[in-house]
């Protein structure tokens, strides 16, 4: 198969003393996200999408939250590992589309920086990376500012042999 599509979804609750990292970018906010790793919910959803596209499970399988080795882990390292696995199967980035679902913080000022980080990690142009944000109009846990949800869809393309 020459193309593969993967979908990823992740949620993290606000809390703790860690800084808020989204898409590899530090976002000024009153709190971070509770997680076993650094809590970068954007990179977790993308990692799941990449793994799903090449039928390699999910990040919980590769980086279990019961393993102390991954406590506080840099999610960019985890993402790069997932992408390396896809490249080992002969795939490279076609395009990526990410939706950040959060009432707060406002994401618009940070979108371009996130796109640049992702383009760097996926060794591609920012034209292949889309990041957008939306709210739930104050409905649900994201609307109550209890956490952030992220959906990611990735298209991987088989490299020419």
Curated annotation (Swiss-Prot):
Pathway: Isoprenoid biosynthesis; isopentenyl diphosphate biosynthesis via DXP pathway; isopentenyl diphosphate from 1-deoxy-D-xylulose 5-phosphate: step 4/6
Binding positions for a divalent metal cation per the UniProt entry: 10, 12, 44
Ligand binding (4-CDP-2-C-methyl-D-erythritol 2-phosphate): 10-12, 36-37, 58-60, 63-67, 102-108, 134-137, 141, 144
E.C. number(s) listed in UniProt: 4.6.1.12
Positions bearing the site annotation: Transition state stabilizer: 36, 135
GO biological process: isopentenyl diphosphate biosynthetic process, methylerythritol 4-phosphate pathway; terpenoid biosynthetic process
Catalyzed reactions: 4-CDP-2-C-methyl-D-erythritol 2-phosphate = 2-C-methyl-D-erythritol 2,4-cyclic diphosphate + CMP
UniProt cofactor note: Binds 1 divalent metal cation per subunit.
Coiled-coil blocks: none
Entry cofactors: a divalent metal cation
Keyword tags: Isoprene biosynthesis, Lyase, Metal-binding
Quaternary assembly: Homotrimer.
The protein's name in its UniProt record: 2-C-methyl-D-erythritol 2,4-cyclodiphosphate synthase
Native source species: Shewanella sediminis (strain HAW-EB3)
């Amino acid at each position: 198969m020459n193309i593969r599509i993967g979908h990823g979804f992740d949620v993290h609750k606000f809390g703790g003393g860690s800084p808020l990292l989204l898409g590899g970018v530090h976002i000024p906010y009153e709190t971070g996200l509770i997680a076993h790793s650094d809590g970068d919910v954007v990179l977790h959803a993308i990692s799941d999408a990449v793994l799903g596209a090449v039928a390699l499970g999910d990040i919980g399988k590769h980086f279990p939250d019961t393993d102390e080795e991954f406590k506080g882990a840099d999610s960019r390292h985890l993402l790069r590992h997932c992408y390396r696995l896809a490249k080992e199967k002969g795939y490279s980035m076609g395009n990526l589309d990410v939706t950040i679902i959060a009432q707060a913080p406002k994401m618009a000022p940070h979108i371009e920086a996130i796109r640049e980080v992702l383009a760097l990690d996926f060794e591609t142009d920012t034209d292949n990376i889309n990041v957008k944000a939306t709210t739930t109009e104050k409905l649900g846990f994201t609307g109550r500012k209890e956490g952030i949800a992220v959906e990611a869809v990735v298209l991987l393309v088989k490299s020419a042999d």
